[in-house]
């Protein structure tokens, strides 16, 4: 199993900060074997803006476990990136899991 160490400071005060931590986390997930699906509408880290409202996601990625069971026991993760608390500049990450996706960012099938 591949591992990855995340060592960047987790600042969340600007669009630049949001893009930096989001992209690094996104890249780390790819490195450890959670590739992005081909779903449309996924977050673009070059242009994403930090939400200015609490409990708001700026976008999402659909990822899946790329292992020997992918064909028979598929698990998709929807990872939403955003802001939990604007006054404290806190980043937010929401994760949902299911057995399928509709190809445009909605999880379907069995949910976990």
Label for each model-derived stretch:
Residues 4-112:
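Long, leucine/valine-rich, helix-dominated scaffolding and oligomerization segments
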């Amino acid at each position: 199993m591949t591992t990855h160490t995340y060592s960047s400071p987790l600042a969340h005060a600007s669009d630049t900060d949001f893009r930096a931590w989001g992209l690094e986390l996104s890249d780390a997930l790819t490195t450890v074997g959670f590739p992005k699906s081909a779903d449309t509408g996924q977050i673009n880290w070059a242009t994403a803006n930090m939400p200015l409202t609490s409990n708001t996601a700026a976008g999402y990625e659909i990822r899946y476990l790329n292992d020997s069971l992918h064909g028979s026991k598929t698990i998709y993760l929807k990872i939403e990136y955003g802001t939990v608390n604007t006054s404290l500049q806190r980043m937010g990450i929401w994760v949902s899991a299911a057995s399928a996706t509709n190809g445009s960012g909605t999880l379907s099938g069995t949910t976990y």
